[in-house]
């Protein structure tokens, strides 16, 4: 009876999930104004900045070792799950009560973190987590792993007002993300 009630409770959230798309993300970008100097070289003469600074970059321009470093750190089973890492989710849930780990272990996958950023839903509740799980599975059906990873890497914060891998690479290493070496990517 308890199991049936739990299944009915969880399945009610399936109908509550609206389609979430990557295109819904509101990303703020800086605007750069360029002019040619006396030698004909284009130079940045003015930059209009937003609260968060971000420079978009295609997944094709992000080296494989940089992608691998993100996946290894954030979601080691990213390429094999359907948006939800059930092992991590159950482990994080059990840790809330039993404290197996010294710190709170996140159970969210890259896709789930992206959902949280798209929706802005940060409520700490089982119902939000269930909605997030269904939305993550939906997003995984609608987009490729590369598109999800690209959007995630262009969105996440790297400290201060720096958001996205390209802005962070330029800020911290003085180079494009496409030029990061293995040590810098880690």
Give residue ranges: language-model regions.
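Juxtamembrane regions of bacterial inner-membrane/periplasmic proteins
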Residues: 1-186
């Amino acid at each position: 009876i308890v199991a049936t009630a739990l299944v009915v409770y969880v399945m009610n959230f399936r109908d509550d999930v609206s389609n979430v798309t990557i295109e819904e993300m509101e990303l703020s970008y800086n605007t750069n104004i360029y002019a040619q100097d006396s030698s004909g070289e284009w130079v940045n003469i003015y930059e209009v900045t937003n609260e968060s600074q971000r420079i978009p970059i295609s997944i094709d321009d992000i080296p494989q070792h940089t992608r691998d470093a993100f996946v290894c750190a954030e979601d080691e089973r990213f390429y094999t799950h359907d948006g939800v890492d059930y092992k991590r989710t159950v482990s994080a849930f059990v840790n809330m009560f039993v404290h197996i780990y010294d710190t709170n272990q996140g159970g969210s996958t890259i896709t789930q973190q992206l959902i949280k950023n798209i929706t802005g839903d940060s409520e700490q509740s089982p119902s939000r987590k269930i909605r997030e799980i269904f939305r993550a599975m939906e997003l995984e059906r609608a987009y490729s792993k590369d598109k999800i990873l690209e959007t995630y890497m262009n969105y996440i914060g790297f400290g201060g007002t720096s958001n996205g891998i390209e802005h962070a690479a330029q800020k911290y290493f003085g180079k494009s993300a496409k030029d990061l070496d293995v040590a810098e990517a880690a």
